[in-house]
From Swiss-Prot:
Modification type N6-lipoyllysine: residues: 63
UniProt keyword terms in alphabetical order: Lipoyl
BP-aspect Gene Ontology terms: glycine decarboxylation via glycine cleavage system
NCBIfam families in the record: gcvH (TIGR00527), PRK01202.1 (NF002270)
InterPro entries: 2-oxoA_DH_lipoyl-BS (IPR003016), Biotin_lipoyl (IPR000089), GCV_H (IPR002930), GCV_H/Fam206 (IPR033753), GCV_H_sub (IPR017453), Single_hybrid_motif (IPR011053)
Cofactor details (free text): Binds 1 lipoyl cofactor covalently.
Name the UniProt record assigns to this protein: Glycine cleavage system H protein
Cofactor(s) this protein requires: (R)-lipoate
Cellular component aspect of the GO annotation: cytosol; glycine cleavage complex
Record flagged with keyword Nucleotide-binding: no
Gene3D superfamilies referenced in this protein's UniProt entry, alphabetically: 2.40.50.100
Domain Lipoyl-binding per the UniProt entry, residue ranges: 22-104
């Protein structure tokens, strides 16, 4: 299981990676492993400004649908269009090609309130 140090984590198993004034958001390796085979990603918030912990979409696996929560407040700029035809990218490369949305955070310093790799690893190993 991967715990990259270049991202921050939430207790709901999302990750965020800030690159300049934008950020990428996805689900963690632990989350995709627990969910199983992802069959559909539904993101309907593109162009909207959301608050931290608001639902920005859902992810569907064979037996359930799970909400996806925004790690920090910001505008949803783009969804990963590749997931429409290849939702399994979330399983195969959760921190790379399997990213879910690109956002413009209201305050990039909010990321500092999230878990680092060691904190997240401790959370999932409880």
């Amino acid at each position: 299981m991967e715990f990259p140090s270049n991202v921050k984590y939430t207790k709901e198993h999302e990750w965020i990676r800030v690159e300049g004034d934008i950020a990428y958001v996805g689900i963690t390796d632990y989350a995709q492993e627990q969910l199983g085979d992802i069959v559909f990603v539904d993101i309907t918030t593109e162009g909207e400004t959301l608050e931290k912990d608001e639902v920005f979409g859902t992810i569907e696996v064979v037996k359930t649908i799970s909400d996806l929560f925004l790690p920090v407040s910001g505008e949803v700029l783009e969804q990963n269009e590749a997931l429409a035809d290849n939702p399994e990218l979330v399983n195969q490369d959760p921190y790379g090609k399997g990213w879910l949305i690109k956002i413009k955070p209201n305050d990039s310093n909010d990321v500092n309130d999230l878990l680092d790799a060691e904190g997240y690893k401790a959370l999932v190993n409880e």
